[in-house]
UniProtKB/Swiss-Prot annotation:
Organism: Oryza nivara (Indian wild rice)
Coiled coil regions, renumbered to chain: none
Entry similarity comment: Belongs to the cytochrome b family. PetD subfamily.
Record bears the keyword Transport: yes
Function: Component of the cytochrome b6-f complex, which mediates electron transfer between photosystem II (PSII) and photosystem I (PSI), cyclic electron flow around PSI, and state transitions.
Name this polypeptide is given: Cytochrome b6-f complex subunit 4
């Protein structure tokens, strides 16, 4: 490779071209038909071949065989339902538990109306939305981890 000359940004002709949007690189290899007809099918077929190869060479069992006469002590939902399961498990009144679950999306729907800012701004310039996101993530993790523990340790995560 040779030495490439850097553009002089003080040049008025170059500044005029950049102001008109002419500084972009529009040349190169076109996506049609090269990428869409040749490269993408190769990638897709390669991915399918890897999946089939792994399934044939390393077959994994789906799980242990079902025993209809043995029920586990505690039946847990899938991992993405852990926070909701924890709310329903710890709140004594079931109606209150359902209202708490409904209040989460309702509260999230009100966040955009609390801040009067442009939606394309930096997240750090939206303190209410950032705070709601961070606190909501922490609470969801806390509830999700607590759902995997026994009911006595679920709220304190066994720390206290």
């Amino acid at each position: 490779m040779g030495v490439s000359k850097k553009p002089d940004l003080n040049d008025p002709v170059l500044r005029a071209k950049l102001a008109k949007g002419m500084g972009h690189n529009y040349y190169g290899e076109p996506a049609w038909p090269n990428d869409l007809l040749y490269i993408f099918p190769v990638v897709i077929l390669g991915t399918i071949a890897c999946n089939v190869g792994l399934a044939v060479l390393e077959p994994s069992m789906i799980g242990e065989p079902a025993d209809p006469f043995a029920t586990p002590l505690e039946i847990l939902p899938e991992w993405y339902f852990f926070p909701v399961f924890q709310i329903l498990r710890t709140v004594p009144n079931k109606l209150l538990g359902v209202l708490l679950m409904v209040s989460v999306p309702t509260g999230l729907l009100t966040v955009p109306f609390l801040e009067n800012v442009n939606k394309f701004q930096n997240p750090f310039r939206r303190p209410v939305a950032t705070t709601v996101f961070l606190i909501g993530t922490a609470v969801a993790l806390w509830l999700g981890i607590g759902a995997t523990l026994p009911i006595e340790k679920s709220l304190t995560l066994g720390l206290f």
